């Protein structure tokens, strides 16, 4: 082939390449669709069956890779949604509570609330659930006058060791003399808030006025700081783990001396003139005011209603037999607690240790009333 022929041939090749390239970059699908046309009359230029093997393979490769990424993202999304759902799913009673484990005692009330005894709850399930919730639990305690020096340090020290281990805890300590509060070193996740309260002339008024004080603190700050709140007497000491099995909307404590007695034998307030009045023939259990709790809003309602009854009695010049405890029992008769704690959670060793008390969680201190209630 002469030189002129070679030049013409080269120009034809270059022109062909340019045309091919121009068709490629202007193709809406980004491939060599316009090079290959099917001879099948049923397949027109816009058919997905048109194409060249290399760009078709390349595009399919990209498509498959992108599809895999999309599938992976969707799967991750589903897993994240499932995780969030698992974290927020309400824990059902029968997921963690087995009343048949303690057939010798009352484990379920007439209104289907659990009575928590050692052995009836699955600690692992409860801990797993509440750990995901990242809860904070509050604990209020009053130490007035000599109660500070006789009981406060041992109460808080034992609570630091056994109360809601592994979860955030705020101790709300109410005293009449901040200068007497001992230094107590707390563990991780624990904090200590001290508040000075006005002292009362009589110990009965101290006991009753705590309902007003707790309610005021819940409204002022506690409701924004904790998920659950317990209110306890200071003359007690923790003996074993007092954990998340005790948490609930409203929680009442069985009184150790009365948990086997007939309701007509309970020391309820029996005078009709009192706002705490409970007639014979009524009553479920006798509840101990040394421990009660629940969500902040429920505890607020408990304290406000009890204090209303106390004020009404004062107006009528009457005082309930067991003061705030009488009003608490009247409240729980009308507003059934969602959970009840067995006497194991507040035991008096003076009773002895019967076979149904498996593990004492919290015990009464020796009541030195002549000492601590003399000019408190």
UniProtKB/Swiss-Prot annotation:
CDD domains according to UniProt: Glyco_transf_6
Keyword vocabulary terms for this entry: Glycoprotein, Glycosyltransferase, Golgi apparatus, Manganese, Membrane, Metal-binding, Signal-anchor, Transferase, Transmembrane, Transmembrane helix
Gene3D superfamilies associated with the record: Spore Coat Polysaccharide Biosynthesis Protein SpsA, Chain A
Annotated catalysed reactions: a beta-D-galactosyl-(1->4)-N-acetyl-beta-D-glucosaminyl derivative + UDP-alpha-D-galactose = an alpha-D-galactosyl-(1->3)-beta-D-galactosyl-(1->4)-N-acetyl-beta-D-glucosaminyl derivative + UDP + H(+)
Recorded topology in the membrane: Single-pass type II membrane protein
Active site: 325
Lumenal compartment segments: 28-376
Subcellular localization, as worded in the UniProt entry: Golgi apparatus, Golgi stack membrane
Gene Ontology biological process terms, A to Z: carbohydrate metabolic process; lipid glycosylation; protein glycosylation
UniProt topological domain (Cytoplasmic) ranges: 1-6
One cellular-component annotation, GO: Golgi cisterna
Domain of life: Eukaryota
Residues given in the record as substrate binding sites: 142-147, 233-235, 255-258, 267, 367-373
Domain description: The conserved DXD motif is involved in cofactor binding. The manganese ion interacts with the beta-phosphate group of UDP and may also have a role in catalysis.
Entry protein name: N-acetyllactosaminide alpha-1,3-galactosyltransferase
Native source species: Callithrix jacchus (White-tufted-ear marmoset)
Gene name for this UniProt entry: GGTA1
